[in-house]
Amino acid sequence: MTLETPVRVLIVDDSAVVRQMLTEILSRDAGIEVVGSAADPLLAREKIKRLNPDVITLDVEMPRMDGLVFLENLMRLRPTPVVMISSLTERGADTTLQALSLGAVDFVSKPKIDVARGLEGYAEEIVSKVKMAAKAKVSALHRPSAPKVTLDMQSAPMPGSALRFRTTDRLVAIGASAGGTEALRVVLEHMPADAPAVVMTQHLPASFSTAFAERLNRHSAMSVREATDGEAILPGHAYLPPGGQHLRIIRDGARWRCRIDDGPPVNRHKPAVDVLFRSVAANAGANAVGAILTGMGDDGARGLLEMLQAGAPTLVQDEASSVVWGMPGAAYKLGAAQEVVPLDRVAERLLALSAQAR
């Protein structure tokens, strides 16, 4: 596919209304061509072979074959960028997170009632995510995992007890978007139980945050949770903003606390990475480390620059391992990143930089 060629899209959804609405929404954009639609995965399988789409939109719950089973088979046999169409329910959130772990690039929320009007309200998001998916590197989601990071007392750069992170004076701040649900899992999976405290912002719908925190917690030696307003930030813990709210940090004497912020969207996002990073720059300065992982757009780039200017070491995920090198690329181009690191080394570098932080 070249830049001049429209993105070829196949729509897979058991609802005729949804198929029609998605066709209308996507066809309005000159850069997209809807080449076909299918009511279930079995029909879709034949159309994929015949139509060779660049992107597939896929409903999660469908007859004849579960959407997750279809997605898993697709990624194994014919990796293709997929944007999931998912319901804004707790069950839908968990299923969508499973889909992202299987290789879906991103998802769009589908309302349970008044679907036609609801999808129209997401038209801009649907178009932008389909176009982004066409450029995404599906293979980046299936890179082999590195072995879990352990602190080697002999090879680490600092002596003695400085390697143990049982203090409150180190903080890691991470931001991510498209592809980030899996990237964050990989990073946290390789952080030890006594790692410095981690504060994170991942672009997600409000109803997804609890399921996402629980999913990360199952994969990490750290304790991963949704932050509550005013709670102390502790080593060995990782904090996400609760649904649809910004996460900031504040200084309280010798420690930091979480501040939940219900202010307006920033960079069209709520939660926004820039909100978190700017608060970290102001309240933690050189005692923090900042990282931007895979994601679309430029949220977090300016905040990461503020962290760097405040004395914090900074890094971004490299393009080769990113599903979308939008946010990391924007930070790099802005001069906000001191290091560009493959995903399987991000945890290792965060630990090393935390040990060196002033």
Swiss-Prot record:
GO terms for biological process: chemotaxis. It comes from the Bacteria. Its EC number is 3.1.1.61, 3.5.1.44. It is found in: Cytoplasm. Keywords: Chemotaxis, Cytoplasm, Hydrolase, Phosphoprotein. Residues 8-125 form the Response regulatory domain. The active site is at 177, 203, 299. It catalyses: [protein]-L-glutamate 5-O-methyl ester + H2O = L-glutamyl-[protein] + methanol + H(+); L-glutaminyl-[protein] + H2O = L-glutamyl-[protein] + NH4(+). The modification 4-aspartylphosphate is found at residue 59. Its main location: cytoplasm. One of its GO terms (molecular function) is phosphorelay response regulator activity. The keyword Cell membrane does not apply. InterPro entries: CheB-like, CheB_C, CheY-like_superfamily, Sig_transdc_resp-reg_Me-estase, Sig_transdc_resp-reg_receiver. Pfam families: CheB_methylest (PF01339), Response_reg (PF00072). Residues 157-352 form the CheB-type methylesterase domain. It is an enzyme of class 3 (hydrolase). Contains a C-terminal catalytic domain, and an N-terminal region which modulates catalytic activity. Belongs to the CheB family. Involved in chemotaxis. Part of a chemotaxis signal transduction system that modulates chemotaxis in response to various stimuli. Catalyzes the demethylation of specific methylglutamate residues introduced into the chemoreceptors (methyl-accepting chemotaxis proteins or MCP) by CheR. Also mediates the irreversible deamidation of specific glutamine residues to glutamic acid. This is Protein-glutamate methylesterase/protein-glutamine glutaminase 2. The lineage of its organism: Bacteria, Pseudomonadati, Pseudomonadota, Gammaproteobacteria, Lysobacterales. The gene is cheB2.
